[in-house]
Amino acid sequence: MTAVIVEDEIPAGIRLERLLNQHEFQVLVVLNSVKKATAWLKENKHPDIVFMDIKLRDGNCFEILDKVKIESKIVFTTAFDEYALNA
């Protein structure tokens, strides 16, 4: 199963990538901003699943979803419960 991680905190991205690799996911890329994620998702075949942090350094992941129709399953990874209803 292929995956993309959208996470701006480097240690969190590394931990998630390691965890996914242990469970036979192929992590295609770890992206750390709305801008990079939007560009990558517009230019590449979408993975089976996208793991997205909600708060990123240059905005939030909902901006990505407004710009790109993502055909993948999405798992939101965040410590902020105020985003639960939006997600």
Where would I find each of the regions flagged by the language model?
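Conserved SAM-binding loop
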Residues: 5, 30, 76-77
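Alpha-helical elements of the RecA-like P-loop NTPase motor core of helicases
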Residues: 14, 39, 85
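CheY-like receiver
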Residues: 47-87
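Two-component/phosphorelay signaling modules centered on CheY-like receiver
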Residues: 9-32
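Extreme N-terminal starter segment of soluble prokaryotic enzymes
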Residues: 1-3
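Structured loop/turn residues at beta-strand edges in well-structured enzyme cores
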Residues: 23-25, 44-45, 70
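Acidic, metal-coordinating helix/loop segments flanking the phosphotransfer/catalytic sites
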Residues: 17, 30-49
